[in-house]
């Protein structure tokens, strides 16, 4: 389900149609990415894309589509069919659409001549000699033959400000771009300011909100809200998302007035109160700024106790990062929810002091029959958070001994232990040395006093990526031989099918490890 609420007086923005030309697109042998690229770019420029058509390499069909679109929209942008082979028929279709004749362009020939020597030399080096000259002649003739009334557009290269190396054909309001995505995107980039001058662009305001509600939960209220702004030139879009773990519906708002935007967003926030998601698809980037914003939001919600826990954990990690060089610090990371919180906090403090390109040292103590999903998450998180993870055999004491042997300089080891953990209950303070009969490391447990709910509050509040097993009914992760989905999260639908709620839906923190047989 999707919904779009458009007021009757949306501003008269410039309109556009995109025509994707090529039999290979219709056959499914080539994926069209050009229309997606063009839609994104045109939308940012304030252009209202009203139509996308995919048509084959047929002159009559190209002509009909061009004629229809050219008369109906301000801009028509085609992609594909402008190459040197027999099935490139866009220029012929344009000539037919505008009742024009084809002619050879010396200007294009000059552009071709600039790269032709390199091309022919390369072909000869590959052993292609016989028939090369004739093939080049025919290809050049095809490339250079365009409708007589064509205007050649030379763009501006972004790198050095010089003219583009190859022109684009325009007839009336129709612009013919190449079909190869790299060349299509480059041509648009180079021509953007020429085709859409800054002073002529429609100024629009865009805003996106996310909610953990389904569309059905608020569709009637949203319809009523849209009606309140029907004379204010507002467009509100509602789009469900079935696979995102953080939100269920995305709302987009467009208007030409910043005042109207503020009023609409305020109304939407009131409508969705308690269910707004501050979605972030890359939580590990610009982490310092996002952390401050997160704490500010929690303060506005009067979550004093939670903020105190955030500050305490942050302070502990900061003290370690300030006191020890990074080569002496290691994070114990097994892909679980608690150490994922620690990974985010450590990345925060390392970014703050050293910058985001600085790697973090970590290690993973393996368990028997480990979930492959947990292994994959460790790999993904290592890439996102720039952490180098070594693997050691378990149990913990054995793994720490292997760590000290491999990296003898390690002193503080950050762990996601909490007081409710089987081993966490023996720790009296968040920072303690291991016992004398253990490998000597400084155990640092910044979230020792956190609850299960606190952990999920932070992970989901910041949209920190976590192992997908937690969305499948697992609340605590061990090995596959001793870990099952949590029975309290089991639901049975009316048709008898079994489902499991995600881990953050568990309401009783004391039951967190009821899905583990060895705890």
From Swiss-Prot:
Its cofactor is Mg(2+). Its EC number is 2.7.7.2. Pathway: Cofactor biosynthesis; FAD biosynthesis; FAD from FMN: step 1/1. Keywords: ATP-binding, FAD, Flavoprotein, FMN, Nucleotide-binding, Nucleotidyltransferase, Transferase. Residues 17-108 are annotated as: Molybdenum cofactor biosynthesis protein-like. Pfam families: FLAD1_M, MoCF_biosynth, PAPS_reduct. GO terms for molecular function: ATP binding; FMN adenylyltransferase activity. It is an enzyme of class 2 (transferase). GO terms for biological process: FAD biosynthetic process. It catalyses: FMN + ATP + H(+) = FAD + diphosphate. Residues 328-485 are annotated as: FAD synthase. Coiled coil: none annotated. In the N-terminal section; belongs to the MoaB/Mog family. The molybdenum cofactor biosynthesis protein-like region may not be functional. Catalyzes the adenylation of flavin mononucleotide (FMN) to form flavin adenine dinucleotide (FAD) coenzyme. This is Probable FAD synthase.
């Amino acid at each position: 389900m999707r919904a779009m609420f458009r007021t009757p007086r949306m501003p008269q923005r410039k309109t556009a149609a995109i025509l994707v030309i090529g039999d290979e697109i219709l056959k499914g042998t080539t994926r069209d990415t050009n229309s997606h690229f063009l839609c994104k770019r045109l939308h940012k420029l304030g252009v209202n894309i009203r139509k996308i058509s995919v048509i084959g390499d047929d002159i009559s069909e190209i002509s009909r589509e061009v004629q229809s679109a050219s008369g109906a929209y301000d801009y028509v942008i085609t992609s594909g069919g402008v190459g040197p082979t027999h099935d490139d028929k866009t220029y012929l279709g344009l000539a037919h659409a505008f009742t024009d004749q084809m002619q050879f362009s010396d200007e294009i020939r000059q552009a071709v001549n600039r790269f032709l020597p390199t091309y022919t030399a390369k072909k000869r080096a590959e052993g292609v000699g016989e028939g090369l000259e004739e093939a080049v002649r025919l290809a050049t003739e095809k490339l250079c033959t365009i409708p007589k009334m064509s205007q050649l557009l030379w763009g501006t290269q972004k790198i050095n400000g010089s003219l583009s190396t190859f022109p684009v054909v325009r007839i009336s309001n129709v612009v013919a771009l190449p079909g190869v995505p790299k060349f299509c995107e480059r041509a648009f980039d180079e021509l953007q300011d020429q085709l859409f001058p800054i002073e002529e662009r429609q100024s629009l305001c865009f805003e996106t909100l996310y909610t953990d509600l389904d569309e059905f939960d608020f569709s009637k209220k949203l319809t009523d809200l849209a009606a309140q702004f029907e004379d204010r030139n507002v467009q509100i879009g509602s789009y469900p998302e079935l696979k995102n773990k953080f939100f269920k519906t995305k709302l987009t708002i467009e208007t030409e007035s910043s005042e109207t935007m503020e009023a609409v967003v305020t109304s939407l926030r009131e409508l969705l109160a308690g269910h707004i998601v501050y979605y972030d698809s890359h939580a590990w980037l610009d982490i310092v700024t996002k952390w401050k914003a997160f704490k500010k939001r929690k303060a506005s919600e009067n979550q004093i106790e939670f903020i105190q826990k955030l500050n305490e954990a942050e302070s502990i990690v900061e003290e370690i990062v300030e006191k020890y060089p990074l080569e002496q610090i290691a994070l114990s990371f097994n892909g679980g929810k608690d150490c994922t919180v620690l990974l985010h906090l450590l990345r925060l403090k390392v970014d703050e002091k050293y910058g985001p390109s600085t790697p973090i040292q970590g290690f993973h103590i393996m368990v028997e029959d480990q979930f492959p999903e947990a292994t994959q998450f460790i790999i993904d998180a290592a890439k996102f958070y720039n952490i180098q993870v070594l693997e050691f055999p378990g149990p913990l004491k054995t793994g720490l001994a292997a760590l000290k042997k491999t990296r003898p300089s390690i002193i503080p080891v950050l762990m996601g232990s909490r007081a409710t953990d089987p081993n966490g209950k023996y720790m009296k303070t968040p920072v303690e040395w291991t016992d004398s009969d253990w490998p000597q490391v400084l155990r640092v447990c910044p979230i020792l006093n956190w609850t299960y709910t606190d952990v999920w509050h932070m992970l989901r509040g910041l949209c920190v990526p976590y192992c997908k097993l937690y969305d499948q009914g697992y609340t605590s992760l061990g090995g596959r031989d001793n870990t099952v989905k949590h029975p309290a999260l089991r639901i049975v639908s009316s048709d008898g099918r079994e489902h499991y709620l995600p881990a953050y839906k568990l309401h009783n923190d004391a039951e967190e490890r009821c899905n583990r047989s060895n705890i």
